[in-house]
Protein backbone atom coordinates (compact mmCIF):
# COMPACT_ATOMS: atom_id res chain seq x y z
CA UNK A 1 0.00 0.00 0.00
CA UNK A 2 2.89 2.39 0.67
CA UNK A 3 4.35 1.84 -2.79
CA UNK A 4 0.94 2.42 -4.35
CA UNK A 5 0.43 5.68 -2.47
CA UNK A 6 3.94 6.86 -3.46
CA UNK A 7 3.20 6.17 -7.12
CA UNK A 8 -0.20 7.89 -6.95
CA UNK A 9 1.27 11.04 -5.39
CA UNK A 10 4.11 11.22 -7.90
CA UNK A 11 1.69 10.65 -10.79
CA UNK A 12 -0.51 13.43 -9.40
CA UNK A 13 2.04 15.92 -10.74
CA UNK A 14 0.90 15.09 -14.27
CA UNK A 15 -2.68 16.04 -13.35
CA UNK A 16 -2.13 19.22 -11.34
CA UNK A 17 -3.75 21.38 -14.01
CA UNK A 18 -3.49 25.13 -14.33
CA UNK A 19 -2.91 25.68 -10.63
CA UNK A 20 0.51 24.04 -10.77
CA UNK A 21 0.14 22.10 -7.52
CA UNK A 22 3.15 19.83 -6.99
CA UNK A 23 3.44 16.66 -4.92
CA UNK A 24 6.47 14.92 -3.44
CA UNK A 25 6.78 12.02 -1.00
CA UNK A 26 8.87 11.30 2.10
CA UNK A 27 9.78 7.75 3.14
CA UNK A 28 11.22 6.79 6.49
CA UNK A 29 11.14 3.95 8.93
CA UNK A 30 8.90 3.35 11.90
CA UNK A 31 8.20 6.46 13.95
CA UNK A 32 9.27 5.70 17.50
CA UNK A 33 6.34 5.78 19.87
CA UNK A 34 3.69 6.11 17.18
CA UNK A 35 0.47 4.18 17.49
CA UNK A 36 1.27 0.48 17.30
CA UNK A 37 5.02 1.04 17.72
CA UNK A 38 6.93 -1.91 19.12
CA UNK A 39 8.56 0.05 21.99
CA UNK A 40 5.34 0.82 23.89
CA UNK A 41 4.13 -2.69 23.04
CA UNK A 42 7.22 -4.29 24.59
CA UNK A 43 6.96 -1.96 27.59
CA UNK A 44 3.31 -2.84 28.13
CA UNK A 45 3.92 -6.61 28.30
CA UNK A 46 7.31 -6.75 29.99
CA UNK A 47 5.70 -7.71 33.31
CA UNK A 48 4.82 -11.08 31.71
CA UNK A 49 8.55 -11.82 31.47
CA UNK A 50 8.41 -12.84 27.80
CA UNK A 51 8.55 -10.68 24.68
CA UNK A 52 7.26 -12.10 21.39
CA UNK A 53 9.80 -11.82 18.56
CA UNK A 54 8.57 -12.47 15.04
CA UNK A 55 11.95 -13.63 13.73
CA UNK A 56 15.45 -13.30 15.17
CA UNK A 57 16.73 -11.96 11.84
CA UNK A 58 14.18 -9.13 11.66
CA UNK A 59 15.60 -5.62 11.21
CA UNK A 60 13.94 -2.21 11.10
CA UNK A 61 14.60 1.45 10.58
CA UNK A 62 13.36 3.59 13.48
CA UNK A 63 13.06 7.37 13.40
CA UNK A 64 12.06 9.94 15.98
CA UNK A 65 9.12 12.22 15.27
CA UNK A 66 11.53 15.17 15.10
CA UNK A 67 13.67 13.45 12.45
CA UNK A 68 10.56 12.76 10.40
CA UNK A 69 9.41 16.38 10.65
CA UNK A 70 12.88 17.61 9.65
CA UNK A 71 12.72 15.47 6.50
CA UNK A 72 9.25 16.81 5.66
CA UNK A 73 10.45 20.42 6.04
CA UNK A 74 13.50 19.72 3.92
CA UNK A 75 11.28 18.21 1.22
CA UNK A 76 9.05 21.31 1.27
CA UNK A 77 12.07 23.56 0.77
CA UNK A 78 13.80 21.40 -1.85
CA UNK A 79 11.02 19.83 -3.92
CA UNK A 80 10.13 20.73 -7.46
CA UNK A 81 7.53 17.96 -7.69
CA UNK A 82 7.57 14.19 -7.96
CA UNK A 83 10.65 13.50 -5.83
CA UNK A 84 10.71 10.82 -3.15
CA UNK A 85 12.90 11.71 -0.15
CA UNK A 86 14.36 8.91 1.97
CA UNK A 87 15.99 9.78 5.30
CA UNK A 88 19.32 8.14 6.14
CA UNK A 89 18.89 6.51 9.53
CA UNK A 90 20.58 3.63 11.32
CA UNK A 91 19.14 0.13 11.34
CA UNK A 92 18.46 -1.98 14.39
CA UNK A 93 17.72 -5.60 15.10
CA UNK A 94 14.37 -6.17 16.76
CA UNK A 95 16.05 -8.60 19.19
CA UNK A 96 18.47 -5.84 20.24
CA UNK A 97 15.60 -3.42 20.82
CA UNK A 98 13.74 -6.01 22.92
CA UNK A 99 16.87 -6.62 25.00
CA UNK A 100 17.33 -2.89 25.62
CA UNK A 101 13.66 -2.20 26.45
CA UNK A 102 13.27 -5.22 28.75
CA UNK A 103 16.62 -6.88 29.54
CA UNK A 104 15.02 -9.09 32.18
CA UNK A 105 12.61 -10.69 29.69
CA UNK A 106 12.99 -13.84 27.68
CA UNK A 107 12.48 -13.54 23.94
CA UNK A 108 10.13 -16.03 22.32
CA UNK A 109 10.14 -16.46 18.54
CA UNK A 110 6.50 -16.55 17.42
CA UNK A 111 6.93 -16.67 13.64
CA UNK A 112 6.36 -14.22 10.86
CA UNK A 113 2.79 -13.15 10.10
CA UNK A 114 1.28 -13.12 6.61
CA UNK A 115 2.44 -10.05 4.70
CA UNK A 116 5.10 -9.12 7.26
CA UNK A 117 8.64 -8.57 6.00
CA UNK A 118 11.90 -9.51 7.66
CA UNK A 119 13.52 -6.26 6.57
CA UNK A 120 12.34 -2.82 5.49
CA UNK A 121 13.33 -1.69 2.04
CA UNK A 122 13.27 2.04 1.38
CA UNK A 123 14.94 2.07 -2.04
CA UNK A 124 14.75 -0.89 -4.40
CA UNK A 125 17.19 -1.73 -7.19
CA UNK A 126 14.62 -0.58 -9.76
CA UNK A 127 14.82 2.95 -8.29
CA UNK A 128 18.63 3.08 -8.39
CA UNK A 129 18.66 4.54 -11.89
CA UNK A 130 16.98 7.71 -10.62
CA UNK A 131 18.36 7.93 -7.07
CA UNK A 132 20.85 10.50 -5.79
CA UNK A 133 22.63 10.58 -2.46
CA UNK A 134 22.97 13.63 -0.19
CA UNK A 135 24.56 13.93 3.26
CA UNK A 136 21.31 13.36 5.22
CA UNK A 137 19.04 11.64 2.71
CA UNK A 138 18.49 10.05 -0.68
CA UNK A 139 16.28 11.52 -3.38
CA UNK A 140 14.51 9.40 -5.99
CA UNK A 141 13.73 11.58 -8.97
CA UNK A 142 10.57 11.10 -11.01
CA UNK A 143 10.76 9.44 -14.40
CA UNK A 144 8.21 11.85 -15.88
CA UNK A 145 9.59 13.64 -18.95
CA UNK A 146 13.27 14.50 -18.36
CA UNK A 147 12.74 15.31 -14.69
CA UNK A 148 15.20 12.60 -13.59
CA UNK A 149 18.07 14.34 -15.38
CA UNK A 150 17.21 17.93 -14.43
CA UNK A 151 20.12 19.81 -12.75
CA UNK A 152 17.47 21.84 -10.88
CA UNK A 153 16.38 18.61 -9.20
CA UNK A 154 19.76 16.89 -8.85
CA UNK A 155 21.61 19.90 -7.39
CA UNK A 156 24.69 18.56 -5.55
CA UNK A 157 23.48 14.95 -5.35
CA UNK A 158 25.73 12.01 -6.13
CA UNK A 159 24.26 9.25 -8.33
CA UNK A 160 24.00 5.90 -6.53
CA UNK A 161 25.38 2.82 -8.30
CA UNK A 162 23.10 0.78 -10.54
CA UNK A 163 21.41 -1.92 -8.47
CA UNK A 164 21.73 0.06 -5.21
CA UNK A 165 19.30 -1.06 -2.49
CA UNK A 166 18.71 0.78 0.80
CA UNK A 167 17.20 -1.66 3.26
CA UNK A 168 17.37 -2.23 6.99
CA UNK A 169 19.45 -5.40 6.57
CA UNK A 170 22.12 -3.95 4.25
CA UNK A 171 22.48 -0.54 5.86
CA UNK A 172 26.03 0.49 6.72
CA UNK A 173 24.94 2.14 9.97
CA UNK A 174 23.63 0.05 12.89
CA UNK A 175 22.53 1.07 16.37
CA UNK A 176 24.40 -0.62 19.21
CA UNK A 177 22.62 -1.49 22.46
CA UNK A 178 24.17 1.59 24.09
CA UNK A 179 23.01 3.82 21.23
CA UNK A 180 19.52 2.33 21.37
CA UNK A 181 19.36 2.91 25.13
CA UNK A 182 20.59 6.51 24.78
CA UNK A 183 18.09 7.11 21.99
CA UNK A 184 15.20 5.74 24.08
CA UNK A 185 16.34 7.75 27.12
CA UNK A 186 16.51 10.94 25.05
CA UNK A 187 13.13 10.39 23.41
CA UNK A 188 11.43 8.49 26.23
CA UNK A 189 8.80 11.10 27.02
CA UNK A 190 7.66 11.00 23.39
CA UNK A 191 7.15 7.24 23.34
CA UNK A 192 3.40 6.76 23.21
CA UNK A 193 1.15 4.05 24.40
CA UNK A 194 -0.79 1.54 22.36
Where are these regions (language model features)?
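Strand-loop microenvironment adjacent to phosphate/nucleotide-handling motifs in alpha/beta enzyme folds
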Residues: 6-194
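Active-site helix of classical SDR
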Residues: 1
Amino acid sequence: TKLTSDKLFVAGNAYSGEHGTRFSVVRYGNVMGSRGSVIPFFSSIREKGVLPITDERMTRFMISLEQGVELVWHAFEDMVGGEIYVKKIPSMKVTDLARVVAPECKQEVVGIRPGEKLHEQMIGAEDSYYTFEYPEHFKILPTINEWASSPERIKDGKKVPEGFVYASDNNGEWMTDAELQAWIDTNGEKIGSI
